[in-house]
Amino acid sequence: MSQGFERYERQYCEISANLSKKCTSAIALDGEQKKQNLSEIKSGVEEAEALVKKMDLEARNLPPNVKSSLLVKLREYKSDLNNFKTEVKRITSGNLNATARDELLEAGMADTLTASADQRSRLMMSTDHLGRTTDRIKDSRRTILETEELGVSILQDLHGQRQSLLRAHETLHGVDDNVGKSKKILTTMTRRMNRNKWTIGAIITVLVLAIIFILYFKLTR
């Protein structure tokens, strides 16, 4: 529920309770006291009507699932406000005699004020219920946000791990290239060593043959 709506609602309930008391006392007053009381009642009705309009604007700007419940409450408040307007007209008319005032005080106003009190009681219960519902919705939203944040964190971790694996793969690929180059170098060195062995062997053979030939030549002479 909107905090603005709750604030206007509390103010309206306070004004409504005050108007009920003033309407009750106004019926038994006369002269200037009655005029003063009636002026205060009219001012209170105007203030209450302004609060109802503000609540209406607040409710219509809320999501549909919350707005529908608040509009039901607003109908109750408007009905309560209309009761006060009716009482203002009756008090203003000044045509009620003492007996009529007593009957109205004992019957009409008692019924009206009782109905208003019952309406306020039901509305306050509805307000508490909506407040609890709003709290549950807020808790659900908070849980969803926490879940989303956890999901984002997990995705970021997975992305980081993927980048690490890609870098490791690139490193291994570089190692494979170096190993391949090393193999080629070793193969080339091995071939050169083999060629050198044959060359050295040939040289040694030639030297041995030369020595043998020289010895043979000296011995035969």
Curated annotation (Swiss-Prot):
Name the family the entry cites.
Answer: Belongs to the VTI1 family.
Report the superkingdom from the record. Answer: Eukaryota
Q: What does this protein do?
A: May function as a v-SNARE responsible for targeting vesicles involved in the secretory pathway. Involved in actin-dependent endosomal trafficking pathways associated with the vacuole within root hairs and root tip epidermal cells. Essential for cell wall organization and polarized root hair growth. Also required for the localization of SYP41 to the trans-Golgi network in root hair cells.
Looking at the UniProt record for this protein, which Gene Ontology cellular component terms does it annotate, in alphabetical order?
A: early endosome membrane; endosome membrane; Golgi apparatus; plant-type vacuole membrane
The way it spans or sits in the membrane comes to:
Single-pass type IV membrane protein
Q: Which segments does the topology annotation call Vesicular?
A: 220-221
* Assembly with partners or alone: Forms SNARE complexes with t-SNAREs.
Which organism does this sequence originate in? Arabidopsis thaliana (Mouse-ear cress)
Transmembrane as a keyword of this entry, yes or no, is: yes
Any one GO biological process: intracellular protein transport
Tissue-level expression: Expressed at low levels in roots, stems, flowers and leaves.
Q: Where in the cell is it found?
A: Vacuole membrane; Prevacuolar compartment membrane; Endosome membrane; Early endosome membrane
* Parts of the chain on the Cytoplasmic side: 1-198
Coiled coil (UniProt feature): 32-93
Tell me what this protein is called: Vesicle transport v-SNARE 13
Q: Summarize what gene deletion causes.
A: Abnormal cell wall organization in root hair and root epidermal cells, probably due to altered endosomal trafficking, and leading to short and branched root hairs. Mislocalization of SYP41 in root hair cells.
Membrane-spanning ranges? 199-219
Task: Spell out the Pfam families in the cross-references.
Answer: V-SNARE, V-SNARE_C
**Molecular functions (GO terms):** SNAP receptor activity
Per UniProt, the keywords (alphabetical) are: Coiled coil, Endosome, Membrane, Protein transport, Transmembrane, Transmembrane helix, Transport, Vacuole
PANTHER family, A to Z: VESICLE TRANSPORT V-SNARE 11-RELATED (PTHR21230:SF67), VESICLE TRANSPORT V-SNARE PROTEIN VTI1-RELATED (PTHR21230)
